[in-house]
Every structure is written in C-alpha cells, then in structure tokens.
Amino acid sequence: RNHYSSPDGQFSTGIWEAEPGHWTVSYSEHEYCEILEGESVLHDADGNTRLLRTGDRFVIPAGFSGSWEVRERTRKVYVIYEPVVDSGA
C-alpha cells in the first residue's frame, strides 16, 4: 500500500506485504526496506542470498536483479527513489 508519491514520481513510500512465494525482480530504483514481520530471502543474480527477518533494515540498489523468496508472510516498510535516467538528448 503506497502512502506517498512525490509529484515527479521519483520518491514513494509505503507498506508492502506478500504471502509465501518466489519470483524474479529487477530494480531500476533504489529501495530502503525495513522488515516489520515475516521471513524472506533475497537472491542476487550471482547466487548470493540474504535472509531477511523482522527488524532487518537494508537497501536494494538500482540495477539489482535476482529474486524474492517469501518463506513466511512478510510485511515491510519501503522508501523508493527512482533516479532520473539521462536520455542522452
């Protein structure tokens, strides 16, 4: 659930939640997260994993690709910054 988005669309914050599952992700944005409840695993494209539990705080950088694995229903606070992409014009 999104709580705020800036008028230019570059900044947003809210609460995300998901039931158990596993899916591929690719981030064009920088995302700060704090896990409010649950357990998930973030897998990067090189096969590294990070176990995420209640109270964990972390940043997913723009350009990250990998997958989210939700092991137990997970809720997180997110803060997203979407950088402006230079079109070269």
Labelled PLM ranges:
Residues H43-A45, E69:
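A generic structural motif
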Residues A18, Y27-L42:
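Short, conserved beta-strand element in jelly-roll/cupin
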Residues D46-A62:
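Short acidic-glycine-tyrosine-enriched beta hairpin
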Residues G9-Y27, P61-A62:
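Conserved short histidine dyad/triad with adjacent acidic residue
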Residues A62-V85:
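Ligand-binding loop in jelly-roll beta-barrel domains
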Residues R1-Q10:
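A short, N-terminal "cap"/entry segment at the start of jelly-roll beta-barrel domains
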Residues W23-V25, G38, D46, L52:
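Amphipathic, hydrophobic secondary-structure cores in small proteins
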